[in-house]
């Protein structure tokens, strides 16, 4: 037993490899014959009719005055341009028919490439992507059948998770400490609370202070010392000097 398991989808179609058709590809005799046949048929059956039709339409537009003619060469430049456009349009319109002829060739690498490309385009979207994804996943999973590394992994002991300790006395994992919820600070509770003063108390206090100030103004015994001391009479000479008698 080689340790590999081969899983394959039953009745799976293996897509044929697309032949490489590069610039250095040399066509076969049948392919050359089909090339010449396509060239002749596209010229006589498509290019010539379209070129003639384009020239007739262009000449009619010029004669009706819809298209202006050249002052020196007349309608010749526009007719040549219409002929060239009709020629290439005929060649391009015959490409599909020429491809069908190559697909009918049995021993033709070019025909095989065209058939493979058509099969890929006609398949449902994601078909080849899903198949390649399935193959890659199967090949990646098939290596675990008899791998010794897988056996060693299974023999390793399984450790149960350590329960988290809810107290400081029990053993706890390294680096993990219990979170102790602290209560409110007692100093904050002991701080005196500010007494709320009502409006009535504040009003009475202001009234008392007003009455005290009013009595001080009316009572002469409470007047200031400098108001109660009588002023001495002094004499003043003509020079403004004063003296006491």
From Swiss-Prot:
This protein's species is Homo sapiens
Tissue specificity comment? Isoform 1 is highly expressed in many tissues, including testis, brain, placenta, ovary, prostate and mammary gland. Isoform 2 expression is restricted to the central nervous system including brain, cerebellum and spinal cord.
Q: What is the lineage of its organism?
A: Eukaryota, Metazoa, Chordata, Craniata, Vertebrata
As for what it does, the entry says: Maintains stem cell potency. Increases STAT3 phosphorylation and controls ERK phosphorylation. May act as a scaffold, increasing STAT3 recruitment onto endosomes. Involved in integrin-mediated cancer cell adhesion and colony formation in ovarian cancer.
What region holds the OCIA domain?
Answer: 1-112
Major location, coarse class?
other
Subunit:
Interacts with OCIAD2. Interacts with STAT3.
Task: Give a Gene Ontology cellular component term annotated to this protein.
Answer: membrane
Q: Where, per the database record, does this protein carry Phosphoserine?
A: 108, 116, 123, 191
Q: What is known of its domains?
A: The OCIA domain is necessary and sufficient for endosomal localization.
Q: Which UniProt keywords apply?
A: Endosome, Phosphoprotein
Q: Extract the ranges annotated as region (Disordered).
A: 111-141, 169-245
What family does the database annotate?
Belongs to the OCIAD1 family.
Question: Has keyword Phosphoprotein?
Answer: yes
Gene name, Swiss-Prot/TrEMBL:
OCIAD1
Here the segments flagged for biased composition (Basic and acidic residues) are 190-210, 224-238
Query: By what name is this protein known?
Result: OCIA domain-containing protein 1
